[in-house]
Amino acid sequence: VLHVIATIEVAAGRRAELLAEFHRLVPLVRAEEGCIEYGPAVDAVTPIAVQAPVRPDVLMVVEKWASLEALQAHSKAPHMAEYRQRVVGLVQRVTLQILEPA
């Protein structure tokens, strides 16, 4: 099992647009073989002192995959290529943290 935390840096003020596109994508990804969990998240405003600063132009994606092979297949899926084309101009940078259970 692999856990993935994707950080998507969004063009200023355009997170709602990206979320609309992303919500179209989610059911397709969740139907992929080996996808255990896949969903968008944004920073919550809380009174917790040690929380990192809220980032209004960042979208996080919390993922869980059955295997490295499933994750690699996901990155090559046709709907992912279509999504990437639709969000040109909205997404500035994507970074992944790929984690394994300790």
Predicted segments, located by residue:
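Absolute protein N-terminus
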Residues: V1-L2, A102
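Generic structural motif
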Residues: A11-G13, P101
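Generic N-terminal initiation segments characterized by hydrophobic and/or small/turn-forming residues
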Residues: R15-A16, F22, P56, L68, ...
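Generic structural signal for secondary-structure transition and capping sites
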Residues: P27-R30, G34, A70, Q92-L96
